[in-house]
Swiss-Prot record:
CDD domains: 5TM_YidC_Alb3 (cd20070), EcYidC-like_peri (cd19961). Belongs to the OXA1/ALB3/YidC family. Type 1 subfamily. Pfam families: 60KD_IMP, YidC_periplas. The keyword Electron transport does not apply. The chain crosses the membrane at residues 10-30, 319-339, 341-361, 407-427, 467-487, 502-522. One of its GO terms (cellular component) is plasma membrane. It comes from Borrelia recurrentis (strain A1). It comes from the Bacteria. This is Membrane protein insertase YidC. Its main location: membrane. The gene is yidC. InterPro entries: Membr_insert_YidC, Membr_insert_YidC_N, YidC/ALB3/OXA1/COX18, YidC/Oxa/ALB_C, YidC_ALB_C, YidC_periplasmic_sf. GO terms for molecular function: membrane insertase activity. GO terms for biological process: protein insertion into membrane; protein transport. Keywords: Cell inner membrane, Cell membrane, Chaperone, Membrane, Protein transport, Transmembrane, Transmembrane helix, Transport.
Length: 545
């Protein structure tokens, strides 16, 4: 095989691995909602001591629901809506994070079966609506009286919002004995968290690969929930999508996952061993971004005085995280100078290409050195064509005498794969790229594909007419042609497919990929074209000297 064809195959072998990587990544992450874990920590769960259904008047409950009023609370970052029925949070919108319809992202919304994202099983004891009281601009109480076994209790839910615009809500549960200083008669109650967060519009469902998942963090391990899983004393439990999540933390909690109405719920069991109840839940509801999550690991960084909560562990780290950290830092530096994330991706790409230029130059030089040996190689091939063993021996001898490595041009190309995979993971999951515009009217969101026309439905699995995939395909073809010295006439059918078929194949693979990733790829292709012209000129000048 000629050295140029060997290099060409190495290039497309790299592209093949890239395509497989992206397809597997998309497939595996889309199945997060059904992920399973084998390791379980069991604890004794006696359900007979939960809220007795005989204490619940279902007809009365329906009447209360019909008469419920909405209470709206606004902070700088949240627009929250509570219901006096149950005193529950029924809607939570993030003011600073818009969806594709340019409206605040609604991270919490009432479930279709009229079930809140999270609720307390003690709510079922209430036979009246909760009374709302605003303690101050950040603290809001919902109060009612409940009867348990002939004894009356004051039931209070206190929601405290951050004074420092942190994406955290403190929920305190109080159940105080009014009449008699006696046991409540209930062994435990449940905090129920379902997975129905971030309601997407029809367009959003087509554009975002918005997988849902329950996750739990315990014993320094991040795991995904499944029906029947029980965990004791986790750091937190939560539900999330690609970019947003709701995480719940509480001291000494026990969690059970169970399917109800075809929805996987997480039940936080809270033991009642006192005459009164006083429990505290910390609920993170916001972006899946370490910038907002990690402040709860150090007491001095958050207004709630929390430490070592480990919310940031919900953001999964890839094997190439050590490469992504400096890349993200470089992007941030460029963004601070020119506040455009699209340009930051382009500048990052140029920096990366400059850093790996020695590898690229070495690869091309190895190819050029092999090209010089073509006449001698052909002589050996003709002379020993009937003796494969002797042919290989003579070829090896020629390489040693000339000081040439026949695969020296392939390794530098393959060594660049980790860099691409790291960039892919960064661009595909970097939260700040969500909603970040590059060219208004064309590339309005770097986290999804570009669009010049939106169909409103799928046409052969496509939802939009996009331009970037066409540019990527053309520049990829030009880059491959410039990088090779092979004459088209000398190419066989297999090599011609590598030249023309692979870019077309990747056009379909990458069609719906985030525009930020395609900007990286296109910039790489253009830089490679210019780089190869420079290398050819440099080597030509050396030969002429």
């Amino acid at each position: 095989m000629s050295p140029n064809k060997r290099i060409l195959r190495a290039v497309y072998l790299s592209l093949f691995f890239i395509g497989i990587f992206m397809l597997l990544d998309d497939f595996l992450f889309s199945r997060k909602a059904s992920s399973f874990m084998n390791e379980e920590i069991k604890f004794d769960l006696n359900k007979d001591f939960d809220i007795d259904n005989s204490l619940i008047d279902e007809d009365f409950t329906f009447n209360l629901s019909d008469n419920s009023e909405d209470i709206n609370v606004d902070t700088d970052i949240y627009h929250a809506t509570f219901a006096t029925f149950g005193g529950n949070l029924i809607s939570l919108k993030l003011k600073n994070h818009l969806n594709l319809d340019k409206k605040p992202t609604e991270i919490v919304k009432v479930h279709p079966q009229n079930q809140s994202l999270f609720y307390i099983t003690l709510d079922k004891l209430s036979k009246s609506l909760f009374l709302y009281e605003q303690i101050d601009s950040h603290v809001h109480d919902f109060k009612t009286n409940v009867e348990v076994n002939g004894k009356y209790y004051e039931y209070i839910k206190r929601y405290t919002f951050s004074k420092s615009n942190e994406y955290l809500i403190k929920l305190e549960i109080f159940l105080n004995n009014i009449d008699v200083n006696d046991d409540i008669g209930i062994d435990f109650y449940k905090f129920v968290l379902n997975s129905g967060i971030e309601e997407l519009s029809a367009k959003g469902k087509l554009q975002y690969n918005n997988y849902l998942s329950h996750a739990i963090y315990y014993d320094t391990k991040l795991r995904y929930g499944k029906d029947g899983l029980n965990i004791a004393n986790p750091k937190w439990v939560g539900a999330g999508t690609k970019y947003f999540e709701v995480l719940v933390s509480k001291e000494n909690m026990k969690v059970e996952f169970k399917h109800e109405n075809k929805v996987l719920n997480a039940f936080i069991l809270n033991k009642l061993d006192n005459k009164n109840v006083s429990d505290v839940f910390y609920i993170y509801a916001g972006p899946r971004d370490n910038k907002y999550l990690d402040i709860f690991n150090q007491r001095e960084l958050n207004s709630f005085g929390l430490s070592n909560v480990e919310f940031g562990m919900s953001v999964e780290k890839s094997l190439l995280y050590f490469l992504q950290v400096p890349m993200q830092l470089i992007m941030q530096i460029f963004y601070n100078v020119i506040p455009n994330w699209g340009l930051s991706i382009m500048f990052l790409t140029i920096v990366v290409r400059i850093l790996i230029f020695p590898l690229t130059f070495k690869s091309f030089r190895a190819t050029a050195e092999l090209s010089k040996l073509q006449p001698k190689m052909k002589e050996i091939q003709v002379k020993f064509k009937s003796d494969p063993k002797r042919l290989n021996e003579e070829m090896g001898k020629l390489y040693r005498e000339e000081g040439v490595n026949p695969i020296g041009g392939c390794f530098p190309i393959l060594l660049q794969l980790p860099v691409f995979f790291a960039l892919y993971g960064l661009v595909n999951n970097f939260f700040v790229l969500r909603g970040a515009s590059f060219i208004p009217g064309w590339i309005d969101d770097l986290s999804i594909g570009d669009s010049i026309y939106y169909f409103g439905y799928k046409v052969f699995a496509w939802t939009d007419i996009r331009i970037l995939p066409f540019i990527m395909m053309i520049t990829q073809l030009l880059s491959t042609i410039v990088s090779s010295n092979v004459s088209f006439k000398s190419l066989g059918s297999q090599q011609k497919f590598l030249y023309f078929g692979m870019p077309i194949m990747f056009f379909f693979i990458l069609y719906d990929m985030p525009s930020g990733l395609l900007i990286y790829w296109i910039t790489t292709n253009i830089f490679t074209i210019l780089q190869q012209y420079y290398i050819k000129m440099n080597l030509s000048e050396r030969r002429n000297k």
